[in-house]
Amino acid sequence: MKIAIDAMGGDHGARIIVLGAVEAVKEYDVNVILTGDEKILKSELSQYEYSKDKIEIIHCSEQIKNEDKPVAAIRRKKDSSMVVALNLVKEKKADAIVSAGNTGALLAGGLLILGRIKGIDRPALAPVYPTSKGVSVLIDGGANADCKPRNFLEFGIMGNIYANKVLGIEEPQVCTVNIGIEEGKGNDITKEAYKVCQRGPFQFKGNVEARDIPLGYADVILCDGFTGNIILKLTEGLATTIFSELKKAFLKNNITKIGALLLKPSLKIFKARFDYSEYGGAPFLGVNGVLIKAHGSSDAKAIKNAIRQGISFVNNDVVGDIVSEIESLEADFIE
């Protein structure tokens, strides 16, 4: 198996991406193709010991930066590390792509280069969301600010397959985010989405309120990308605030410091539950290929886990299952 990695993407440059790739080839049965500036990549790789036949470099003369306009960058920067990596997947020279680069450009590239799965109107980001019961899949995490009711059905199908095949959740419970659990709650879109999802090929549980999401009420959480991104960002900010306030409380005096020392192992486990690097990245579901979007500020651990995620998607043929499920839908679900 080969994973293409956009080695020039991310906030920390090639150093972190290369280290994550090296750790991945040591731990997993995978080969990696690094796309980017050959001189920089060779310099970074020279610092580590690894099986030389496990990592390949493809030189790219261009780089898509965070300030670049997504669609224009994909169309104009043909020799950028991101575009080259996407084309490797399209041409079947790589089984998946991992990138921590410009999110808008990566999603645009996924659509323009890999293309949509037939029957999927809106591909979507599907990050995992930590809960008191484990993790849930939240879809859409930010790719589509506005959605139609039928998009919720597509999200449910894709999220259900992801939760089952990759996360190992038996018969995932699927819910739509709403301001109340009753069927008649919400706006016109969410009301109609509820009706459509009731007929979907998955275990539809109904609506879920935001307060119940962290409690693990649903295994797959359906919402438009605007709502999903707000949920994610609010949770990230809240987690950061909680840990910051705990730190202040534990450092207040010598007694609290002793308490902190005793609780350190448990606090470490608790903090890891909210650490995005533990989960890797968010898959862009609905395109013809495995595309994993890693966080822009990913460390080496996050990159390694994003590669692991890509491996799992390929091994479980998630894309193939989505294609089959969409093809088997009745025409009135899609039209």
From Swiss-Prot:
Sorted UniProt keywords: Cytoplasm, Lipid biosynthesis, Lipid metabolism, Phospholipid biosynthesis, Phospholipid metabolism, Transferase
Any single GO CC term annotated in Swiss-Prot or TrEMBL for this entry: cytoplasm
Function: Catalyzes the reversible formation of acyl-phosphate (acyl-PO(4)) from acyl-[acyl-carrier-protein] (acyl-ACP). This enzyme utilizes acyl-ACP as fatty acyl donor, but not acyl-CoA.
InterPro entries membership: FA_synthesis, Phospholipid_synth_PlsX-like
EC top class named in words: transferase
Cystine crosslinks: none
Protein name: Phosphate acyltransferase
Any single biological process term in GO: fatty acid biosynthetic process
GO function terms (MF aspect): phosphate:acyl-[acyl carrier protein] acyltransferase activity
Protein family according to the UniProt entry: Belongs to the PlsX family.
Pathway: Lipid metabolism; phospholipid metabolism
